[in-house]
Amino acid sequence: SSFNGEDRNPVWADKDTYYYLSEASGHFNVHKASLSSSQNVQITKHTQHPVRFLSIADDGTLCYGYDGGIYTLKEGGAPKKVEISVVSDKTDRDLIRRIQRSGAREIALSPDAKEVAFILRGDVYVTSLEYNTTKQITNTAEQERNIDFSPDGRSIVYASEREGLWQIYQSTLANKDEKLFTYATDIQEERLTQSSATSFQPLYSPDGKEVAFLENRSEIRVINLATKQVRTVMDGKFEYSYSDGDQWYQWSPDSRWILTNYIGVGGWNNKDVALVNASGNGEIHNLTQSGYNDTGARWVLDGKAMIWESDRAGYRSHGSWGAEGDIYIMFFDLEAYERFLMSKEDLAMLEEEEKAKKESEESEAGKDKDKKKDKKSGAKDKAEKDKVKPLEFDLENRLDRIVRLTRHSSRLGDAILTKKGDKLYYQATFEGGFDLWEQDLKENKTKLLVKGMGRGMMIQDKKGENVYFCSGGNIQKVSIKDGSKKPISFEALFDYKPYGERAYIFDHAWQQVKDKFYKEDIHGVDWESYRDAYRRFLPAINNNYDFQEMLSEMLGELNGSHTGARYYPDGPTLSTANLGVFYDESYEGDGLKIKEILKKGPFAIKKLDVTPGCIIEKIDGTAIKAGMDYFPLLEGKVGKKVHLAIYNPATGKRSQVVVKAISSSQQTELLYKRWVDRNRKMVDELSGGRIAYVHVRDMDSPSFRTVYSEILSDKNRNREALVVDTRHNGGGWLHDDLATLLSGKEYQRFVPHGQYIGSDPFNKWLKPSCVLMCEDNYSNAHGFPWVYKELQIGKLIGTPVPGTMTAVWWETQIDPSIVFGIPQVGCVDMRGQYMENNQLNPDIEVYNKPEDSLIGVDKQLEAAVKEMLKAADAAKK
């Protein structure tokens, strides 16, 4: 076909004629074409929805799906909808009651540390810390999240997405005699926000009078609980939310300020920490003022300082990925800073002096008090004592009062500083997974406290004795004194509503696209009409496989990349193993005839004496007959030893061998290396060793490190040109790193005593290069070739690449087996053109024909070598 768009699903009518689906009319329809003619005919004329699932019967009858129906079509006739009426008993239930003992996704600790609230499959629960008694607070098919306890412990605030809109809700103990949610008999819920804008991630102010929340995902707003008046604290233009839950802010102890992440103008990849006045007067202070990434600030030392994470000291990202972080502290108070820097000895002396002074003052004060003082005045004194004084900040010198707390940079999780400021507890990955580490800031010692803790937000109790966290669906309590860990058990009654839950996920996905799709006009589609068109199928869907298909079809109407839904059911009980060989498909006798043995596969051991041409006659004692389905013989044998009976026709000998079978992913890895080795060998042979070759497998850090290592190695750095192969790359985020690596211009040489030992820049490719690309380059594998061409680094060779350069968020649902994607960050060139749906054309267009691929011919690679030889010759002149 020749349509400059999408054609798919061809089916043969006869040896010359075929049918296929084409979007040439604006919607997928059935087209007819033949090998003997360049003409094609549109057979169906459907609009609004695409034709899908084209197939053909032996008698030439076409069958396809359209708008939820099945149609048939005979040559010369009109499409006929197949009337289907299925009579069946309803065996699936609308409500399934379960007891859940795991699956918690986030937690909030009550102020008295007697109970913990958590989210389980989108509902709010509270459980006792001593017993597994659990109270369900919400029971909806929709989703609740972002829980927080009020300072008095009598209310819980959370966000809930009901009727397609996230709003803030509060559940409160209605009976004044009841103190705990776990055992409460009367809990009342009220909706706090009444806006038409997305509102979630609420947090109580420490005085309990107000609740802060995010509106439209990045604007910080505050609602006064008494008056219900709402004010804006920080405009949303100063932050950007890529995925829900990625924002962070925290109230100050005096309820007057908020610490938050801050991008300012254009600082998406260089975040700072900002101090924001909670009154809504617009006062914002960028505290960190750094080109590095500074995030996740927490108030410490009663508001006199903050700790936060920064990647300024650790290993830098090598290929846009992999930067390591550290925990830092910034002081807003000189006295607190000087106290923090004291040695253990000096601090002990100071504390003794302070203790003596306090005792003296209390003694003097006691003499002046009336011994018959009534309870009312006593309560007044207590209230005055508990009153939090307004914080005062010395911000002018804050950058001179920064201390790095962690000794070793690493990938970090959460971190907590003790109330005295003498120890830091943090999650880090020094030894594989996330562990809990203790940094003694006075002794300058680091020790492992809890192995295999996992990664998650840690909550410290008021006494500072324990931390609570949720990881892997379980709630844990850890003593920071000795690292002992206690699971917090719960028994949550969960009402699973499969139909209601799928309806919620459908509406949620529709709304997420409306709110977050990278273009506000959603590519001009009538998104409202598509919701109605697809939602009508929900009552007939009783499983997630069909639901995922329907959701994907609706998302496919967006005409955008990175859309669609995925369903991840529980894996098969037994996975089928592989033997790492190609079989001779033309062989018709008993057994499996080996055509090729994959390098580094199970048979790639010399002592086995198994070569191409040998026949596998038996697998674990079972003979393989001609045409037999042998795959069941390998079920459940990944990583296990398999006993094989081998016959070698060349020698007439039979032998018994034992190999360790491999998984499909392991075999795919061997096939990939085989393909790369073949390409590298081909380039060496075609260029006589003058041209280097490298393949960029993915747009990620491991791939970048491979590319960097190979092209700057002694083997390749002295070659005259480079072929950068990006074919079949599925994307990631590496465009600028690769473009920078390949755009080096030599500006000086290092020559000690007449010997050339290197050039500057030494960390870039300095010679001609080209980029190979093909039809299935995707996402950032479209973005990098585009950047390469835009910066005029070299030529693109291969086939046109569809415009798919957007950044996606694949969101896992409350049913974690369902995931869907939203392309939400568009990339716009300096001419104002979005790269999405903007095809990238090569400078030299070359197609690899299927018949060439079957015999190992790669016309694209040949063209690249030819072009690089020209460039190498030109560079010599």
Go through each PLM region and give its residues.
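A flexible loop/linker signature enriched in serine peptidases of the S9 family
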Residues: 1-8, 19-31, 37, 45-52, ...
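Conserved blade-ending motifs and adjacent loop-strand segments that build the rim/top face
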Residues: 6, 41-55, 285-298, 406-413, ...
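Blade-terminus and WD-like Trp-Asp/Gly-His loop motifs, strongest in beta-propeller folds
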Residues: 10-17, 54-60, 107-114, 147-155, ...
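A short helix->beta-strand "capping" segment at the edge of beta-propeller domains
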Residues: 87-104, 185-191, 391-409
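Terminal targeting/pro-maturation regions of precursor/exported proteins
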Residues: 317, 481-484, 489-553, 557-558, ...
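Extended, small/polar residue-biased N-terminal targeting/export presequences
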Residues: 539-590, 652-678, 859, 865-877
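PDZ/PDZ-like domain segments forming the peptide/carboxylate-binding groove
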Residues: 574-627, 825-826
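Cleft-lining beta-strand/loop regions that shape enzyme active-site pockets
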Residues: 595, 602, 617, 622-623, ...
